[in-house]
Amino acid sequence: MTNKEILKKQIIYRSAHRGSKEMDILLGNFVKGHIDDFSDDDLKNLEQILFIEDEILYRWYFDKKDSDVIPNNKVSKMLKDFRLYQNK
């Protein structure tokens, strides 16, 4: 197993086992839908986001509160634009 494969597995697990159900669902679905599209740098950026406390991520995503803790990169922009329930 390569380092990238190991990192992907860790990210998949951590994104779905956060501690709050809302963030488990949001991050778990986001990661599940995008993990194979991410470059090595994107995976590192995503891992950095997963180290941020749920409360901060929740406010940033759901309440649209800006946070200096959230990095401004491609992955955070994709997450910000991610919608759990899209009309099909």
Where are these regions (language model features)?
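Positively charged, polar, low-complexity stretches
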Residues: T2-K44, I49-K88
